[in-house]
Every structure is written in C-alpha cells, then in structure tokens.
C-alpha cells in the first residue's frame, strides 16, 4: 500500500505550486484550464455556497476547500484552535461560510493570504495546479501550525488531534527463514496506482485495489537474519504487508490517474467503483463525505467536487451549485481522483 508520510512523499511536489520554487512541475505546466463562468449562480434552498473561480484556474483549490467543508471532525478541531492560529481561524471561517446555506458565491482570499504568510510562499494561480498536491500541502501546513501546549483530544469527540494523520505498520517476512521485521510510519493518505485502462478489466473495485496494494511479494530482498547465519545466502524473497495500525479520522484515498508510459504522459480513465461506506481492520467504519473528480486530459481539464451536507449530496462546480445524489456521486467511476471518507465512530480508536 503506497502511503504519504508527512514531509516525505509529496514534500518536493507541493513546493512547485508556489513562487520561489525552482521550476513548475511538468504536469502542472501542461494544464490548460476550462472553467465555468464566475457569475453568480444561486440555488434556492441549497445547503452550501459556491466559490468564485477568481483567476480562471482556481478549480483545483475550490474543490479541495469544498471537500474539506464536509468533514465534521475537521470543523470541530478548527473551531477549537481559532484563537491560536490565524490560518486555523481563516480556514474555519471560510468552511463555515461554505456551509451557511444559499447565497452569493464567496472567495477564499483571507484564507489564501493566511496560507501564504504561514508558508512564506506565493500561491501560483496563473496556471492550473494539482488538487492532490494542494491538499497535501495544506494538511502539512496545518500540522506545522498546530499548537503543542494543550491536549486537545480531551475535549474532542475523537481521540486524536490531527484528523488527517494515521499510523501505518509495515511487516516484512523473509520467505526463507520466516523472520519478521516491523516498522511504523506516519501517513496522511493512501495512493493507489490504477491498472491500465485497456487491461481487460471493464471495472475495478476500490476494495480490490486496496487489498492488492496491501501485500506485495519482493523477490530481491536481503535478510539480516539469513546474513548472520549464512552471508552467501542472504539474498532471498519476502512478503511485505502494509496496513493501518491507527487509521486517520479522515481517510484520503488518491487514485493516480496520470502516469508515464512509452507514449509519454497519459491519463488513465479506467473505471474504479467505490462504496459509500468502508470498513478498515473489521472495526473502523467510514462514510464517504466528499470526492473530487477531474475531467479532460493531461493537457487540459477541470476539477469539481461532490459533497455531502445536511444529508443531501451537492455538486460544487466553482460558483455553480446543483443538487446531486449519492448515486450520481458513486457513478463518477472514470473521473474520481480523490475520495474523502470520515470515520463514523472515531472513539472506537481508544
């Protein structure tokens, strides 16, 4: 299972979103954005507000913010930390406005200013960027801004003070001597590589991808135990298993739809079915709270968000808000690139 440890996997990638970085990623540079009008789009009795696409390229950050607004555990912790961090305060204010019912679309200006001040980098919005990289950068920045003087878990409805962060356990067992080594790492998401679009699989389930990614056979493995007993025969094979020891309250699942092939940079539109509810380790129950889709190709495209609010599914397409449904959200099997599941009973982690 590919995971995203803090400040390791995407640390270099998200720096390219900001001015001052050496270069822009090839992926971002190839994007030509297509977006809806920034005019006012009001929906009577809507539970959420839209976000203006101010630069014409803001769909990547708008969909991330809309997705976060549906995460109840995040809103709870932001509320508690408003007085200790300007970034927490402006993000909480923005997400609350998004959830405040029908009205004119809003802009995330104050929050983005706080984010730029916190990172001392200017957000590049003149070209389309990657929503997953922006999300990872935001999660890591929130973690760095977290106050360490108070045990917030004592007053939260969930036992950890970082809802995006979990602990992964890696077990490696030698196929020759059966020795087992165990290590732990911090992770914020699951990154899943997808099978080729024309591999013969018309539809692949998310659960099957997660299970296949959880356990891997490694043929070229050097076993320390075998080396001690017979240095000449220390090269062997092993079974590597990666699983959550303590899963996060908010589970991010990234579907990697862009890959490099012999034909260059390509987009993978393989159909991936995903459930509305998910169970980890046979005891941690999750519900799908939001998802981000991307339409287009590697050279142009547009992000939008499907999110659950007040028991109703909505489609947030920048400033345009339309009523959706769970079935419509689950039908985005060829365009979904980022899924947000929130734990239904977080206190079960205690």
Swiss-Prot record:
One term of GO molecular function: cysteine-type deubiquitinase activity
UniProt cross-references to Pfam families, sorted A to Z: UCH
Keyword tags: Hydrolase, Protease, Thiol protease, Ubl conjugation pathway
All copies of domain USP, residue ranges: 49-344
Entry's EC annotation: 3.4.19.12
Recorded superkingdom: Eukaryota
Any Gene Ontology CC annotation: nucleus
Keyword field contains Protease: yes
Active site: 59, 302
Keyword Amino-acid biosynthesis recorded: no
One GO biological process term: protein deubiquitination
InterPro entries with a match to the protein in the record: Papain-like_cys_pep_sf, Peptidase_C19, Peptidase_C19_UCH, USP_CS, USP_dom
Reactions that this protein is recorded to catalyse: Thiol-dependent hydrolysis of ester, thioester, amide, peptide and isopeptide bonds formed by the C-terminal Gly of ubiquitin (a 76-residue protein attached to proteins as an intracellular targeting signal)
Annotated family: Belongs to the peptidase C19 family.
Name of the protein: Ubiquitin carboxyl-terminal hydrolase 11
Species of provenance: Schizosaccharomyces pombe (strain 972 / ATCC 24843) (Fission yeast)
Gene: ubp11
């Amino acid at each position: 299972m590919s995971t995203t440890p803090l400040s390791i996997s995407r640390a270099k990638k998200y720096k390219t979103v900001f001015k001052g970085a050496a270069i822009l990623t090839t992926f971002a540079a190839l994007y030509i954005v297509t977006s809806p009008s920034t005019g006012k789009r009001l929906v009577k009795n809507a539970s959420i507000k839209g976000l203006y696409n101010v630069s014409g390229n803001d769909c990547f950050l708008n969909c991330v913010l809309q997705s976060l607004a549906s995460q109840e555990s995040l809103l709870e912790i932001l509320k508690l930390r408003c007085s200790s961090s300007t970034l927490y305060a402006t993000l909480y204010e923005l997400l609350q406005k998004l959830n405040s019912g029908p009205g004119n679309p809003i802009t995330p200006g104050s929050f983005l200013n706080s984010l730029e001040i916190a990172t001392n980098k200017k957000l590049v919005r003149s070209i389309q960027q990657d929503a997953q990289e922006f999300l990872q950068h935001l999660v890591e920045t929130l973690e760095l801004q977290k106050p360490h003087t108070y045990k917030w878990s004592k007053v939260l409805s969930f036992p950890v003070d970082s809802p995006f962060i979990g602990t992964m356990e890696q077990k490696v067992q030698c196929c020759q001597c059966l020795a087992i080594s165990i290590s732990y790492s911090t992770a914020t998401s699951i990154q899943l590589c997808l099978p080729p679009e024309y591999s013969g699989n018309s539809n692949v389930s998310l659960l099957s991808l997660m299970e296949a990614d959880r356990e891997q056979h490694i043929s070229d493995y050097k076993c320390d135990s075998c080396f001690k007993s017979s240095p000449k025969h220390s090269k062997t094979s092993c079974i590597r298993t990666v699983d959550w020891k303590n899963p996060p309250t908010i589970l991010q699942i990234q579907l990697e739809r862009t890959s490099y092939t012999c034909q260059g940079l390509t987009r993978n539109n393989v159909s991936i079915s995903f459930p509305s509810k998910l169970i980890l380790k046979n005891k941690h129950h999750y519900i799908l709270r939001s998802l981000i889709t991307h339409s287009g190709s590697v050279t142009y495209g547009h992000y939008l968000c499907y999110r659950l609010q007040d028991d109703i599914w909505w489609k947030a397409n920048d400033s345009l808000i339309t009523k959706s449904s769970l079935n419509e959200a689950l039908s985005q099997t060829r365009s979904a690139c980022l899924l947000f599941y929130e734990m239904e009973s977080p206190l079960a982690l205690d």
